């Protein structure tokens, strides 16, 4: 009973639907959300897979799997799998993806891929129509149906993130990494945004501050008390707060912000610490690294 109770805390999503409707994009989106993902799982293995998850005793609590006609004997096997899940008392939800026939035909032509039922019907249109008929029953059992005909990949990803992110946690889907660095040691090659703060007054030239770092209160107070610093921080914060929702909407899951000064020990450390404290209040996941602090 202990394992069964724990499975009620698991979110178990079965992704299915029309070939070409965007299941690959959707499973990638679930992976970005931290789900344990399986693509192209034959329906006959779904119940066994769920049992294994239940035996993990809560170590895996978000699962998404794709099961479609690629798995073979799909139409009968999926109904059997759902029956087994119900018999086992395993809760699940079905996400069904579809698109208009004309749109699906265009997608197969653009990608030059064969519809999985092509060999049976030798016609893309006929294969799509037959697949749609066969999927009608499972469609009526689905908890959510998404028609992707007029959706770009980015819009589909955003739809999944908003649908499957707990209320109030949408911003946490974007991981922001802040890196302080020294230009004398080279730019971080993977940075998305770079702020050069070498124009700020340098504590290095203050004898009592030189041996300290930007993590020390006296250095922080020195750097932050200048009007130029205050103006810069206001403008930088406005820019970043404007950009983060845009990046999130675009489908980004990670953003690397680099802040550089000459040596990476004083000014960039102070500014990076300040930025981290500001962004933590917005709900985004934040990581901070002082790359060159000890060099």
Curated annotation (Swiss-Prot):
A Gene Ontology molecular function term of the record = ATP binding
Binding residues for GTP: 68-71
> InterPro entries annotated for this entry?
P-loop_NTPase, RapZ-like, RapZ-like_N, RapZ_C
Keywords assigned by UniProt, alphabetized: ATP-binding, GTP-binding, Nucleotide-binding
Q: Determine the domain of life of the protein's source.
A: Bacteria
Positions annotated to bind ATP: 17-24
Q: Which residues form a coiled coil?
A: none
Report if keyword 4Fe-4S is assigned.
Answer: no
Task: List the Pfam families.
Answer: PapZ_C, RapZ-like_N
Give the similarity note. Answer: Belongs to the RapZ-like family.
Function, as annotated, reads: Displays ATPase and GTPase activities.
Q: What is this protein called?
A: Nucleotide-binding protein Nther_2024
Annotated organism of origin: Natranaerobius thermophilus (strain ATCC BAA-1301 / DSM 18059 / JW/NM-WN-LF)
């Amino acid at each position: 009973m202990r394992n069964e109770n724990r499975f009620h805390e698991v979110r178990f999503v079965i992704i299915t639907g029309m070939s070409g409707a965007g299941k690959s994009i959707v499973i990638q989106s679930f992976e970005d959300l931290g789900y344990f993902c399986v693509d192209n799982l034959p329906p006959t293995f779904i119940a066994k897979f769920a049992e294994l998850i239940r035996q993990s005793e809560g170590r895996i609590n978000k699962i998404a799997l794709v099961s479609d006609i690629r798995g073979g004997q799909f139409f009968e096997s999926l109904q059997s799998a759902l029956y087994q899940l119900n018999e086992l008392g395993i809760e699940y939800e079905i996400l069904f993806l579809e698109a208009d026939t004309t749109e699906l035909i265009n997608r197969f032509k653009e990608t030059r891929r064969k519809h999985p039922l092509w060999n049976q019907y030798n016609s893309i249109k006929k294969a799509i129509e037959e697949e749609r008929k066969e999927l009608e029953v499972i469609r009526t059992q689905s908890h959510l149906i998404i028609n992707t005909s007029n959706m770009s990949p980015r819009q589909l990803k955003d739809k999944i993130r908003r649908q499957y992110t707990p209320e109030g946690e949408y911003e946490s889907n974007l991981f922001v990494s802040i890196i302080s660095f020294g230009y004398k040691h080279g730019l971080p090659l993977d940075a998305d945004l770079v702020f050069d703060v070498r124009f700020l007054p340098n504590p290095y030239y203050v004898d009592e501050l030189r041996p300290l770092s930007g993590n020390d209160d006296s250095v922080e107070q020195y750097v932050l008390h200048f009007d130029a610093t205050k103006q810069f921080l206001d403008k930088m914060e406005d820019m970043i707060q404007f950009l983060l929702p845009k990046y999130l909407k675009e489908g980004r899951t990670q953003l690397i912000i680099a802040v550089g000064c000459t040596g990476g020990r004083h000014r960039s450390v102070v500014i990076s610490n300040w930025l981290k404290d500001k962004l933590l209040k917005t709900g985004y996941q934040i990581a901070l690294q002082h790359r060159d602090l000890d060099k």
